[in-house]
Amino acid sequence: VATADNDLTLAQWGAIKQAWGGCAYCGADASSMQKDCVQAISRGGRYTLGNVVPVCPSCNASKCNAEVTTWLRRKRLDERRFLERFVEINRELADRFGDV
């Protein structure tokens, strides 16, 4: 990923992981979270504060570059819960770090 596409700092990544407390998609334990772009890089997304969530390796591999809501429905995960938390957490992060 080019530098211009990776604006996420280590402090921001730590805050994101802490805010979610586990996999943003399935809720799995927070022990080995990976960065996932809600809007995939292949769809114009970037590794930025407002687009990255912590995910377990299984969800990360499964979602790949799929559109997040379509993927959540296909996996029968709670789309509404994810979207509500995503908005809430991004508001909190914006207050802490500036606009997301």
Language-model regions, residue ranges each:
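Short, charged surface segments at domain edges that flank catalytic/cofactor-binding sites
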Residues: 1-22, 81-90, 94-97
